Regions:
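Beta-sheet-rich non-transmembrane sensory/scaffold domains
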Residues: 39-729
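Sec-dependent signal peptide recognition
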Residues: 23-28
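Residue-level signal for mature regions of secreted extracellular proteins and peptides
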Residues: 31-32, 338
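C-terminal motif of bacterial Sec signal peptides marking the signal peptidase cleavage site
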Residues: 34-37
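N-terminal secretory signal peptides that target proteins for export/translocation
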Residues: 1-21
Length: 729
């Protein structure tokens, strides 16, 4: 698997792990189950109940969500647990998983940001690259135009962020280090949000606790003559608790940064977004049900199916529902309470998965001293998340996904259900559900970019094959699907039927041409206004241009074939320029992946897209920051010029054993696009570190933790171990 990019290698390695801590671009255990909407509050702060309105009518299709009457949740869960027992499963999460969306793909947003009130106006700047303007995503480096907040690892090769630091920009463009705080060792943070006019940071991540159980809960009912030994038949600790962590940090100007309070929500983190001062966190909770599925102990016989089913009758709502806790800074104990009541959860009766999982949407007011919050939940899992400034869309599957022979396989013909929630501050309202053919793929960093809201319609690009591979060499020789990709347009019906109706699909009878060639996978998808751009790849890189101006009659208007592929498509320059940047990999005509490829496309003529220029950096095995997630690029629009910075690890040295290349240096590679002349220009590279020995590059800090931001005429490169390199552009 040496030719695979690191995100794909990690995905393969983790497909059989049901309870691993969520990591960037990782795979975690998820059951794909029934979905619904719930309300609830939290202890230790001001709870805002979701608004009470007219109850939705009974669903008219299996996709829609139905309200749960008292006792219905418990009955539903007991039914699912009995199904698991009948199937011979040994844990609630066995046999089902999905990708956590801890990271989603990157797209440029306007670089000019309004500075905090009461502070001297800093220059315009480019911070985290986002999918939607006005919808912030967590990242390890943020700036308000005057200060830089960074989260860093302690040593090269580490995978855990251990320090939060602040640096202040000086008049000459240099950085002055402020104070830093150590992050709790038991928490694994993914990134931070900046809110409340720069006065508060919200760090988001997870806390996973392991234990070696010493007692079998059903041992006394198995056999009175069984040995009482406590030796385990399995040598590995068991996950006993997974919680999403929200650490609120004071970041007022002129004060040292310091932790303010911490919230814990049962379940692992799917992803988070911030709109204005409201943090939205999506989490997913897999109850353990230890009485039903005890860890086997040496000397104790495994419980029979009848004994397991008897334990199911003793399951109660507190065993099902997640909790939330808040601990103010300096407090000795946290206040804990259920996140929701059982009657707050809704069900999707037609869901075929047997696993039990609750997914929660929690809104937190970061500007509120008491951290007022509200929650909605649904019974089921999530394998895709997209958020506009007004709505949150959660994509799910009603069928399980399994790993087999290095491939990921959807059972039967894959379909994706999409549930829409309206959001406005603390208000979270279920709006409706729809279903589309295909699925969002297996790469968690890209699933959100396969959805886009435009004029209240949701456009979705799905992948039609029931199996996927991680790299060209694993690609099957043939694929039955006629079109690798399907475009669907969904519209809320506006009535009482809580539906997202499919108003158009492509290909269709009128326009049957496939999107992609047989055997290809969907790599990059980018929606821009009334257009969509889709990249598929197996041996060459077809770029398709879709005209969505008439949502009832979408069409493919243009196609461009080049060597290699683009993992990400990023608009550059003014919209009128019609320019797009592609970042991915070069490849041979046989599909063998080579170095990092950066391409400038002219898509101003939808019928005739052109590749104006391209650069290939390094040999096979070279990586860019975008191989590790959506935030591995920084774009700054200055008039008709776009300044581009991408961390890269460049392989140029042939191994002493021959046959492959090893890392030569790690750096920030820079380009500039002139939208008037439509040119791509190289800028001097900021070298972070060079590798003297053959294996030194493999021991260096991961590109996953390298970033850059631009402020005025300066660029700041966060490199190895949290060290900044400041330079004029």
């Amino acid at each position: 698997m040496s030719h695979l990019n690191p995100r794909h290698r990690l995905a393969i390695e983790r497909t059989t792990q049901c309870h691993t801590p969520a990591v960037r671009y990782g795979v975690v255990a998820v059951a794909l189950l029934a979905l619904g909407a719930c309300g609830g509050g939290a202890g230790g702060g001001t709870t805002v109940s979701p608004p009470v309105g007219v109850e939705p009518p009974s669903p008219i299709s299996p996709v829609a969500l139905a309200a749960s009457e008292p006792g219905a949740l418990l009955s539903y869960v007991q039914k699912k647990l009995n199904q698991q027992i009948d199937q011979g499963l040994t844990s609630n999460s066995e046999g089902a998983f999905a990708f956590t969306g801890a990271l989603l793909s990157a797209v440029a947003t306007p670089a000019g940001v309004t500075p905090s009130s009461g502070v001297a106006s800093p220059p315009n700047f480019a911070s985290t690259t986002l999918q939607e303007g006005g919808v912030d995503e967590s990242d390890i480096l943020k700036t308000d135009g005057s200060r830089l907040f960074s989260m860093t690892v302690a040593r090269p090769g580490d995978q855990q962020l251990t320090k939060l630091a602040v640096h202040t920009r000086q008049a000459d463009g240099s950085l002055q280090a402020g104070n830093s705080i150590a992050l709790p060792s038991e928490d694994r943070f993914n990134g931070l949000h900046l809110a409340a006019n720069g006065e508060r940071l919200a760090l988001v991540g997870q806390n996973v606790k392991y234990a070696v159980p010493l007692v079998n809960p059903l041992a006394s009912s198995v056999s009175s003559t069984t040995s009482s030994t406590t030796a385990l038949t399995t040598p590995f600790p068991t996950v006993v608790q997974t919680q999403t962590v929200i650490n609120i940090v004071n970041s007022k100007v002129g004060q040292p940064i310091g932790s303010n309070s911490t919230l814990h929500i049962d379940g692992y983190l799917i992803d988070s977004r911030t709109i204005d001062n409201t943090l939205y966190v999506v989490t997913s909770w897999l109850p353990r049900f230890d009485d039903v599925f005890p860890v086997p102990l040496a000397g104790n016989a495994s419980p029979t199916a009848a004994q397991r089913k008897e334990a199911v009758t003793r399951v109660t709502n507190p065993k099902i529902l997640p909790t939330v806790s808040i601990k103010p800074d300096g407090a000795s104990q946290a206040s804990i309470q259920p996140l929701m009541a059982d009657t707050d959860c809704q069900l999707q009766a037609a869901n075929a998965s047997s696993a039990v999982q609750l997914t929660t949407i929690t809104a937190v007011n970061l500007a509120s001293p008491s951290l007022e919050r509200s929650s909605r939940c649904f019974l089921g899992g999530v394998n895709g998340l997209y958020m506009s400034t007004k709505n949150l869309y959660l994509a799910t599957s009603r069928t399980d996904v399994v790993a087999k022979g290095g491939s990921l396989i959807y059972g039967g013909e894959p379909t994706t259900d999409i549930h829409k929630f309206g959001v406005s501050g603390m208000t979270i309202n279920y709006r409706g559900s729809g279903s589309v053919s295909g699925h969002l793929g297996w790469d968690a960093s890209k699933t959100s970019y396969r959805m886009s809201e435009h004029n209240n319609d949701l456009r979705v690009v799905t992948y039609t094959s029931s199996f996927g591979w991680f790299g060209v060499l694993e690609a099957p020789s043939s694929v039955a699907a006629k079109s690798p990709a399907i475009l669907s347009v969904l519209r809320e019906d506006g009535g009482a039927t809580v539906q997202l109706k499919t108003i158009a699909v492509l290909p269709n009878q009128k326009r049957p041409a496939p999107i992609g060639l047989s055997g290809e996978q969907v790599y990059a998808v980018r929606f821009l206004g009334a257009r969509a751009y889709v990249v598929t790849f197996r041996r060459i890189d077809p770029l398709y241009v879709l005209d969505l101006a008439d949502p009832l009659d979408p069409k493919v208007t243009g196609e461009l074939k080049t060597n290699g592929y683009s993992d990400y498509l990023l608009p550059v320059g003014p919209d009128s320029a019609g320019l797009m940047l592609g970042v991915g990999k070069d490849a041979t005509t046989e599909g063998r992946v080579l170095g990092v490829k950066v391409s400038l496309f002219d898509v101003s003529n939808a019928a005739a897209p052109k590749e104006l220029a391209s650069r290939v950096i390094g040999k096979a095995g070279s990586l860019s920051g975008l191989d590790f997630g959506r935030h591995g690029v920084n774009l700054f629009n200055v008039g008709n010029t776009t300044r581009i910075a991408i961390p890269m690890r460049v392989n140029e040295t042939l191994s002493t054993s021959g046959g492959f290349y090893v890392p030569s240096y790690q750096s920030l590679v820079r380009f500039e696009v002139d939208a008037v002349n439509k040119t791509l220009t190289d800028k001097p590279t900021l070298v972070g570190q060079t590798f003297a020995s053959e294996f030194a590059g493999y021991l260096a800090s991961s590109l996953e933790f390298e970033r850059s931001v631009q402020i005025g005429e300066n660029i700041y490169y966060l490199g190895s171990q949290g060290r900044f390199t400041a330079s004029g552009w």
